[in-house]
Amino acid sequence: MTKDNLYRYLFDNASVRGELVQLEKSYQEVIAAHDYPVAIQHLLGELMAATSLLTATLKFSGDISIQLQGDGPVSLAVINGNNLQQLRGVSRWDGDIAADAQLQSLFGKGHMVITLTPDDGERYQGVVALDKETLSECLEAYFEQSEQLPTKIKLFADAKQAAGMFLQVLPTDGNHNEEFEHLSVLTETVKQEELFTLEAEEVLHRLYHEEEVRLFEPVAITFNCTCSKERSAQAIRTVAKEEIDSIIAEQGKIEMGCEYCNSKYVFDAIDVEAIYAVAPNSGTTQ
């Protein structure tokens, strides 16, 4: 069974679209970067599944991020994705967290920010409160607020895998709420074990065996961190050289780490001189 794929499907007898996502390797790469508590691992898995599902709805080339913030023990959890289904993510927390901790106990009073950033065009940002019991319900509230389209989302994660389903009325003329409600009831019956162990085609057959479902070719999902030594060098260049020289004099090197993949980039005195020998904008030596 191939994991790390997103599947789109349509109903020939209803104006409703669906998506199904199954994650394993990409999910493991995200949670391997830090020693995350179990509850945060599962949260990041659900967030990855959600980001993949939402990315598939984009009508443009660009990025999407789902960011959760709050005043609880977890201050931040974010997953970034793009139209190529490349995902990365990170979380910040403080103290011990129970393995069965739920959304509101993790974030306290919090909110979710969904940011859409086209390669060409204006950025869009939507904000909803984390005042529901589950991430799925918060995302459904976001769609109700931003698109006014009936939407159903199911998310699952354990220590090894993550998965999710997305169901939404197509933005067409007419009232298709009755069709959606019927399919939503069927989708609600999906079990975590089914999404973790069965092929997408079998899952859809079990859920919608009396419907006319058209399943499209899968899209591969990968973990992709955009960090590099050059990007770290660019960050150093934004700091006054005197300040960097002071750190080098005291520590002998500058070490920069990536929160997303835990890579480390080390710069010594020679590296620093080379960084500042390049004009910030022109890329030519002075």
UniProtKB/Swiss-Prot annotation:
Pfam family, one: HSP33
Main location: cytoplasm
Keywords for this protein: Chaperone, Cytoplasm, Disulfide bond, Redox-active center, Zinc
Species whose genome carries this gene: Shewanella piezotolerans (strain WP3 / JCM 13877)
InterPro entries tied to this protein: Heat_shock_Hsp33, Heat_shock_Hsp33_C, Heat_shock_Hsp33_N, Hsp33_helix_hairpin_bin_dom_sf
The family this protein is said to belong to: Belongs to the HSP33 family.
Higher taxonomy: Bacteria, Pseudomonadati, Pseudomonadota, Gammaproteobacteria, Alteromonadales
UniProt name for this protein: 33 kDa chaperonin
Subcellular location as annotated: Cytoplasm
GO annotation (BP), single: protein refolding
Gene: hslO
Annotated signal peptide: none
Record GO cellular component, one term: cytoplasm
Function noted in UniProt: Redox regulated molecular chaperone. Protects both thermally unfolding and oxidatively damaged proteins from irreversible aggregation. Plays an important role in the bacterial defense system toward oxidative stress.
HAMAP family assigned: HslO (MF_00117)
Modification(s) after translation: Under oxidizing conditions two disulfide bonds are formed involving the reactive cysteines. Under reducing conditions zinc is bound to the reactive cysteines and the protein is inactive.
CDD domains: Hsp33
Positions of disulphide bridges: C225-C227, C258-C261
One Gene Ontology term of the molecular function aspect: unfolded protein binding
